[in-house]
Regions:
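OB-fold ssDNA-binding interfaces and closely related basic DNA-contact patches used
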Residues: 1-146
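Acidic, gly/ser/pro-rich intrinsically disordered tails
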Residues: 1-3, 217-260
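Broad gene-expression machinery/nucleic-acid interaction feature
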Residues: 52-54, 185-187, 202, 206-207
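Solvent-exposed residues in well-ordered beta-strands and their adjoining turns
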Residues: 58-62, 193, 213
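Signature of extracytoplasmic/envelope-associated structural regions
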Residues: 145-161, 173-177, 219, 236
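Exposed beta-sheet edge/beta-hairpin loop segments within beta-rich domains
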Residues: 157, 161-185, 193-203
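OB-fold/S1-family single-stranded nucleic acid-binding modules
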Residues: 197-218
Length: 260
């Protein structure tokens, strides 16, 4: 069942070109047009299913659901608990052994603890920014949980982008995915699920949609044009204003336009 989380921060945003991480050291990217071409190639058609859109969701531990006293992480936990219970039920094809349910529920938001306690039998993509070694030099992850949510570009027998929106008058309006950058803030709709890989089981998240609410300081190593050239443009504008102010003054005195 999908759950909406926000306000959260977005990192490692991959919404324009889908990413194939089969080779972790050398990931590949492809646009929807390129994936369409691949589908028409009998040799490469099978590769399309490896391409995914994704974002890394940074969820502050003390962040609350807007207008309520409920923590966002608690809302997510309810959805995760439901997903685990479903995976252990007779209705699920995953057939999660009931003996794993307590541990999966207890450690679902700490991948490090899960790894230590279960020796890779159980996994989770959720990391605790206060204990994860990889977060030590990333202060924006401290005091927060983070996890990757993704979705195949080819799903339901067709190629589809992730729906991306911005706030509108009374309802969200569509937003070009290229307008969402690593570091921006917003809301995400995700669906937690339990997967099976060999003898291991784990928690992952489908990415359903993204709502961008505001720009944030870039986390991808780039800077916006405003940040890069803001001071220069401001100084240029002031200088231009002085020049044209002087021109206007001279015109007023002479009664003639200096531009003909």
């Amino acid at each position: 069942m999908a759950v909406t989380l926000g306000k959260v921060r977005l990192s490692y945003v991959t919404l324009v070109d889908a990413k194939d991480s089969t080779d972790v050291e050398h990931p590949k990217f492809a646009s929807l047009d390129q994936l369409h071409e691949m589908l028409g190639d009998a040799i490469r058609a099978g590769e399309v299913s490896d391409y995914k859109f994704s974002v890394n969701v940074i969820l502050p531990k003390d962040a609350k659901v807007p207008g309520t006293s409920e923590l966002i992480i608690d809302r997510l936990e309810k959805a995760v608990m439901d997903a685990i219970d479903y995976a252990a039920s007779d209705r699920s094809k995953t057939k999660l052994p009931t003996k794993y349910v307590p541990t999966l529920k207890k450690l679902w938001k700490d991948s490090g603890a899960m790894l230590t306690e279960t020796q890779n039998i159980l996994k989770t993509v959720v990391r605790d920014g206060d204990t994860d070694e990889r977060a030590q030099d990333k202060p924006y992850l401290h005091g927060a949980y983070n996890f990757t949510a993704d979705q195949r570009a080819y799903r339901r027998n067709q190629l589809s982008p992730i729906p991306v929106f911005a706030p509108g008058a009374g309802r969200p309006v569509e937003l070009d995915p290229s307008e969402v950058h690593s570091g921006d803030y917003g809301f995400v709709s995700v669906t937690p699920y339990v997967y099976k890989f060999g003898k291991a089981y784990g928690i992952k998240f489908f990415l359903e949609s993204v709502l961008k609410t505001e720009d944030g300081e870039r986390l991808d190593g780039t800077v916006s044009a405003e940040s890069a050239f803001g001071d220069v443009l401001e100084a240029y504008a002031e200088q231009s204003q002085d020049v044209f102010g002087e021109v206007a003054s001279q015109e007023a005195e002479s009664g003639k336009s200096m531009f003909g």
